[in-house]
């Protein structure tokens, strides 16, 4: 018998003397009735060690699979970070071009803007867009246009939103480094635990059947014929690619050609043309009748005011034409660059969000792996601690004492057994209670006490 098995079997020999007689002097009289106790104990010890070694092997296999998943996540993080940096670079380039164009436009076209603004802010435009059927969205678009154009050309305009701070990227990088360090240490601990358990396996190899030896020494990628008794949560298999698809962020956005400013230019010209076509001086029409037909009831008062100011509105045509020319000729690049900047900023935000999501998935994967490894180690890791003990020899049997507790001088009432284990475990002793309504020499009592001793021994070595 190999040393690790002897370490456990020594307890069983204690029980041999404890249960075989009421007192130590009467051992010879009853020893023959309990010769099966060490044999039962050895069989149970072998079964427990075998079960624990199976769990350690399964733990190693699971950790290797988790390492593959972790490597995929780290690869996705690296790719996403590169894409995020590309998006940031693109936004910075567009922002630089936009700032240059804005400076040139501000310096050269202040006068043109002063002539354009009255057209856009005039009551004629507001009245017409509120009264003419089919133009309900023009008013909001005009407000949006005014807000954006003031932002470009007014000296009091708000600054463009700054790109994400470098400090934020640094925090994210530190978090990823922390995750990588923790996972690497977890992998090292799992490998070390398996190595110590493998040492125990080699010492007890001849005690195991051939099938178990082939399984424990087989490649981890082969089918496991001895799966440990674990919960469904631990044994559940999920492919990383099925849970977490990592799209390419540069496929999310394209075609920057759509511009709100082009639509506003068209609205201005259509409005001017509609005013001119509808209110020709030589046309003799019943203006009130036309108004009642073409204008909505809820805007009746506003539309009547529009009719009264018709002559004044026609005078604004030249100014609005100048405004149209200004938008299309004097600062043609500013609106388009602004749209490109907004799209680039959106791309940066999406890439940052995606990067954060992958970081969160990696963090969850780490925490889930730690949880699974702790549960498996708690159940099976005790067997690896046998490797840290010196070889057990026959002399250790003589250095251990087990004393039955006798109540009231009645030797038949041995309900407790005190075991002195100071030569093996740091704790000096522990107590095993006999099961109620069972005799000291019954088979059920033997199995019960063996199980209690094994439970005490395994509990002592549950560390990590």
Curated annotation (Swiss-Prot):
Belongs to the clusterin family. InterPro entries: Clusterin-like, Clusterin_C, Clusterin_N. It is found in: Secreted. Its main location: secreted. This is Clusterin-like protein 1. Glycans are attached at residues 195, 255, 309, 349, 398, 429. Keywords: Coiled coil, Disulfide bond, Glycoprotein, Secreted, Signal. GO terms for molecular function: misfolded protein binding. Disulfide bonds join 105-331, 116-323, 119-320, 124-313, 131-303. Residues 1-20 form the signal peptide.
